[in-house]
């Protein structure tokens, strides 16, 4: 059977519990039609690049699906009807990715960095050592 990666965006107003219920509902549709959901990832609330139906943020959810194309058609039909889902995208892939997705790896990488992009190590002036004497002081002591 073909493999699909399916991402849907739920309204920002929806609670995390409602998004979980949407995910369970979609998973039920997939399994009811003979498919299988191999991975489910919730990426949380993220900012959108542009407004979609007056929303600036949305809950992002990824599903990896193993099943025929009729499942994808039914899932997308259900999502068009649902008012809480503002956008969805399904892509057919040759094989499903094992482990965390690129977005989850990026979130882990962002947590390891500070606001300037460097590692979270050291403190104030930790690597520089003490100051060198200024040129004025050394030339003044030589002239005397």
Swiss-Prot record:
Residues 97-144 are annotated as: Disordered. Pfam families: Ribosomal_S6. One of its GO terms (cellular component) is cytosolic small ribosomal subunit. Residues 105-137 have a biased composition (Basic and acidic residues). Belongs to the bacterial ribosomal protein bS6 family. One of its GO terms (biological process) is translation. This is Small ribosomal subunit protein bS6. InterPro entries: Ribosomal_bS6 (IPR000529), Ribosomal_bS6_sf (IPR035980), Ribosomal_S6_plastid/chlpt (IPR020814), Transl_elong_EF1B/ribsomal_bS6 (IPR014717). HAMAP family: Ribosomal_bS6. Keywords: Ribonucleoprotein, Ribosomal protein, RNA-binding, rRNA-binding. Binds together with bS18 to 16S ribosomal RNA. It comes from Afipia carboxidovorans (strain ATCC 49405 / DSM 1227 / KCTC 32145 / OM5) (Oligotropha carboxidovorans). The keyword Zinc does not apply. One of its GO terms (molecular function) is structural constituent of ribosome.
